[in-house]
Amino acid sequence: MPPLILASSSPYRRELLARLQLPFSVQSPNIDESPQLGEAPEHTALRLAQAKARKVAETFPNALIIGCDQVATLDGLQLGKPLTHDNAVRQLTLMRGRSVVFHSALCVYNALTQEMQADVVPYTVKFRDLSDRQIESYLQKEQPYQCAGSAKSEGLGIAIIAAMQGDDPNALIGLPLIRLIDMLASQGVDVI
């Protein structure tokens, strides 16, 4: 098996990949993550996942590289990482009582053969109708400023969620494991 590399700085994606009990390393790709003008959210996520994998391939030309990215959308509006407290307040205020689709893009790039498999796995979350006090309390406790849509379902964020719908709950955290297992199998990597 070629070296397996996760092209991500996310500790949550690292934890998810570790569940598969495969040896892997982590590299943080340094790319511009800005959406392009008029770009559909799922295309933004897919483009960034692929760009991250290709960036890491520049340094590791014999590796099997996993790239991923996530973009949240509310009625077509892209909700990226808030980065600041004020932006997170704005996002959660906008999202309260509404449904948000998280587009989790995944690619597996074989740097040696230059074969790339890619997909976007959507996951829908309906948020509770939170008060301003609840939003502030959540943000003070969780500080999800590096998470698309200002929510971390793997932590206290589950308390601000009313319902979830999708094929793979791991997609909400940012790494669709069910689809990843299929992609790895097509590269000769069996998880079990």
From Swiss-Prot:
GO terms for cellular component: cytoplasm. Belongs to the Maf family. YceF subfamily. It is found in: Cytoplasm. GO terms for molecular function: nucleoside triphosphate diphosphatase activity. This is 7-methyl-GTP pyrophosphatase. InterPro entries: ITPase-like_fam, Maf-like. The keyword Ligase does not apply. The record marks Y12, Q70, E154 as: Important for substrate specificity. Its EC number is 3.6.1.-. It comes from Methylobacillus flagellatus (strain ATCC 51484 / DSM 6875 / VKM B-1610 / KT). GO terms for biological process: nucleotide metabolic process. Nucleoside triphosphate pyrophosphatase that hydrolyzes 7-methyl-GTP (m(7)GTP). May have a dual role in cell division arrest and in preventing the incorporation of modified nucleotides into cellular nucleic acids. Keywords: Cytoplasm, Hydrolase, Nucleotide metabolism. It catalyses: N(7)-methyl-GTP + H2O = N(7)-methyl-GMP + diphosphate + H(+). The active site is at D69 (proton acceptor). Its cofactor is a divalent metal cation.
